[in-house]
């Protein structure tokens, strides 16, 4: 079947179709909700949700599917459906009253027993259902069976027709009696009214709950019945004739409807008063005015019914009735009648209550006839009454407190959502607030939240005003905003909505009223709070109305202020206000040049005052308050501006050139942070505009990028001109610069990369290169600045590409050189003394170490460095080491890489690159040497350069690098102060040398082996170093030798190449022999035992005896054994001889044995004549170790013996010969033979 679009149906036809097949219980008030409610505001049985009200208003059958049988059961009796009410109207209403009595009696029987309570609930529910069914039947009967009045009398009437004609009058009387019987809602007993508080989720209700809701049903159904009767009677007036005849009072269906409406509204207001007594002002809008959802529905029913009838001029409108009743609350009860209207409930604050209930009632207009929520503007407003309430609220006689005033205005703000704008309300409120601008509008019991606050920044000032323009309801508005700000919210909402709805801006209607309140005297009376409120007002107006006109007027008004009478805090507030207007300009994409120039000129004046003010601390503080306000404001403008195309450069004038030199500490930090933000913002926006990435609308003005770029050039020019000269002057300051200086310099470097044309002329033609040379590669700049500066730039791909494009290949090498210097100079700012560091110094040191660690991580990612590390096979964990160890690892990697090269060109290039990495390395450590500290700095310098000498020995051995080696030795190891033997070296310096000397010795010994051209000179240098430091590190006694190991011992015993070790050993032993083992006559040299202990330690650790040992050391040791009687010397000497003899044995035959024999032969010849017994004793000891050696010396010994006897001229020396024979007895057969010879000669 083809689909079709049904024609539009009228409301009445649609209702008829909906109920065609439905049959349900008659509607009633119900606050019982189930899970199947479908999210509706009211129960499905309610008059709204069931459609009952809608059917009545549309003149449809109230219950089309009910009461269709010929007979109907009511109150337990059968009645004829079509005639029952006409024939038995009084009886039926009497039965209704009986049922009400019966339900009232059940209340007395209420029980806490669950079984009894369930029975009572069931019985009460049945009674209520009987009553409701009857009243619905009355309504249906009138609609279906009551004939409209006939205009002409056709003669004699049937008795039923007579009864039918009298029925409307009788019905009015019965309804009147019924209303009198049930009385006022508020007059119900307290135990019945307490049923409002029963939870709606309950399943079993007490009789009181049923009775209370039955009263609500009766009150409403009486109105429905009267309305249906009026419609059926074709709006003719129905008089209650019998009542009139009895009482003389007039009673009609119209009067009864109006009276009952008034009474019902009075009752509902009375219930709301009871509810309001428990409501705090801060919770007014979140606290409902109805104790039960059924009361809410009843209010909506009244609004809909009275609104419908008012259209036909049948009844007063809803607001008229409500206003009348609310006005009566303001009158003190003077009679019993006035008391009865609202029962015993007295309203302590009728003004607040009236605004509160009007606001909540206005919100109920959003519900339609079906109880569905429709958020739309209402044509029917109650502004006139609200105006009267507001006049009372802010009247001088009333003196309403701020805590109530906030609630009153919050109600008005809520009403703005429902009703069209009202100029009178604005006028009334503005008249009040214009007189009280200096008020703080605080609520004492709110504490700090209730205090008036002055906005600290222009952005917070603007955000505060913007919050007043927010259309969303803010639950915490009472606590977060004072009444003045709520007034501004009302003003903003009314102006915006009127402009949107009518197209005519209401600003033209109210501008005169606002401007007229400000004149010279009034402006001069404003306090700081008053100025804040002044700016809040005009900022809001600038947002929602004509911005330029308003700002121009504000500037004129501020000119009324006398400058000398404006306090510093007021001046700062005025500047913040100006910047808030600038932010509005920026958000509206309006050029700011006029206002920016006015502000920047004022800033220039204050910056100059700040520069020249020296000793007046208070004046300086006041000026800084203004200056910091300006800086914050400019920063907010730059951060807010989307394209920086609105003349923002006007804010960066030459006032900053005067300000920067005068700033100290936190002040300078603030300015530099601000500068970083501005540079970063400019670069970001410039990049986006250059790439054509325009946010927002794709149909942007095509000229925008071109205009924006012109402004970007102007901003960049202002930055270079007014900020950079100061930065440049601070890079070589006497004290370490702040980290922000490095950050800002890095920002300028990147700015030079993005917009090179506007850099200063002395940086051209390659400003990026110039910036690197100034802040990154200059050896005179503080290492703290360099490390942080380069850390920002090392990994910048655009920067690397720029250097590559300009063909500058030394970029990475120079960066590595700077890293070398930063690591070497990490302690340069510490005092040279050994005093404990303060917490501040520790913090600075820690921060610099963290910065160096980050720089090291980035350096190791440079392509050149990665290549070197890769070739040297350095493991990844090296990258995570501290800077000192990482630098040592890099030095080792360079050395290993060089050693792995094969061709001469490669090696030559590597030497040049290594020297480029170093730069003038001695210049980096000179500050430590000059200050002779700090100890950490000296140790670091000597250690790192020692590593260079050792691990770069092959490089330093080349002709290109040898000059650096000589400078290192002259500067670090053999300076003039070392050569002065009578002058004691500083302890810190000596300690640093002792810790690292072995590195220099090992490296230098390698170079001595490699260098051909200058080998002799290098050997001489090596000898000089050993000569100068051997004695300095030699302990006074052998027992102290192991306590602090001698650096030369470390050098000699480390794992180095054989030629290198031999060269160092030979040189060291030569120096020891020449300078530390020479006797002065028979007097032994000083610290002889320590010298011998050193030699012994070398022999023991190397586990070998070299030829040089025999040549240089053995003669001296043998001499010590002969000439020195000290037990320790003899003992150590004996062990040395033992080691040497055994060492030569290990190298059997050859040069070592020959040299050993030669030394002993000479020893015999030199000392036998005088020290024969000692010589023979020594040789006895040697014979035990090497009998062959001593046997080979027999001829020499015998000849020496004879020579000695000859010289003495006394013949044979028996004692000598006996000593000699004892020696010979240790030499087996050869010795026995020699003894025999000697005896034969004697015979």
Curated annotation (Swiss-Prot):
Keywords: Chromatin regulator, Chromosome, DNA damage, DNA repair, DNA-binding, Nucleus. It comes from the Eukaryota. It is found in: Nucleus; Chromosome. It holds the Pfam family MMS22L_N. GO terms for molecular function: single-stranded DNA binding. One of its GO terms (cellular component) is site of DNA damage. GO terms for biological process: chromatin organization; double-strand break repair via homologous recombination; replication fork processing. The keyword Signal does not apply. Component of the MMS22L-TONSL complex, a complex that promotes homologous recombination-mediated repair of double-strand breaks (DSBs) at stalled or collapsed replication forks. The MMS22L-TONSL complex is required to maintain genome integrity during DNA replication. It mediates the assembly of RAD51 filaments on single-stranded DNA (ssDNA): the MMS22L-TONSL complex is recruited to DSBs following histone replacement by histone chaperones and eviction of the replication protein A complex (RPA/RP-A) from DSBs. Component of the MMS22L-TONSL complex. Belongs to the MMS22 family. MMS22L subfamily. This is Protein MMS22-like. It comes from Gallus gallus. The gene is MMS22L.
